């Protein structure tokens, strides 16, 4: 890995991205289905959820804008797409399906945005970017699942919309350690600041 780091550095990747206020928090898809190893979960996701409880408490204490995302398909699958074709089980995530509900310990409060999405990114086809912009957010802390999937997609889009993404490394999780580690490395090189919760706060 040291050789890879040197290669990236020589080519100009991995430049430090300094967080600047105001801050916001995005929690990506921490729903029951991704907390359950029998459905879409496993790996280090339970620990990431527990760490996000503390991160969310701090965000609320500081008065930061907080947004959550859920995957929600129409009851009749009228909005079924290539994402659902690639991962058919996701089509079971409906508005009232328990698997699509945000885990109780991170339940949204009044004034927090809940984005319903059918694509990996929490930004694609949603009001999230406008909502964050209206609240003046410059640095967006990101937690959620999975690191290699919807978290990464949301981080890339956050950067593309002009926000500074800060991936809180112990508050994101994946069902397998390899993809988790590889995507944290890659996001740190190209798209985001990446650091654990204690350092981020």
PLM region descriptions:
Residues 191-201:
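A charged, well-structured terminal subsegment
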Residues 141-144, 162-177:
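A short glycine-rich beta-strand->turn/loop micro-motif centered on a GG-aromatic cluster
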Residues 96-144:
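Internal catalytic-core helix/loop-beta-alpha segment
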Residues 1-109, 113:
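Active-site acidic carboxylates
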Residues 175-188:
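Active-site-proximal loop->helix
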Residues 61-64, 136, 162:
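Glycine-centered short loops/turns at secondary-structure junctions
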Residues 147-154:
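Short glycine/serine/threonine-rich phosphate/pyrophosphate-binding segments
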């Amino acid at each position: 890995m040291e050789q890879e780091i040197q290669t990236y550095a020589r080519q100009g990747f991995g430049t430090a991205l300094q967080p600047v206020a105001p801050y916001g928090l995005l929690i990506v898809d921490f729903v029951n289905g991704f907390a359950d190893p029998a459905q879409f979960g496993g790996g280090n996701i339970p620990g990431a959820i527990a760490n996000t409880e503390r991160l969310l408490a701090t965000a609320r204490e500081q008065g930061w804008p907080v947004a959550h995302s859920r995957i929600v398909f129409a009851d009749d699958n009228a909005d079924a797409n290539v994402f659902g074709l690639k991962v058919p089980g996701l089509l079971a995530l409906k508005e009232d399906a328990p698997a699509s509900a945000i885990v109780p310990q991170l339940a949204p409060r009044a004034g927090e945005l809940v984005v319903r999405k059918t694509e990996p990114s929490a930004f694609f086809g949603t009001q999230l970017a406008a909502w964050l912009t209206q609240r003046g957010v410059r640095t967006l802390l990101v937690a959620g699942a999975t690191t290699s999937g919807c978290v990464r997609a949301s981080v890339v889009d956050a950067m593309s919309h002009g926000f500074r993404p800060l991936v809180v490394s112990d508050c994101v999780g994946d069902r397998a350690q390899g993809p988790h580690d590889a995507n944290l490395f890659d996001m740190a090189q190209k798209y985001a600041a990446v650091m654990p919760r204690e350092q981020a706060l």
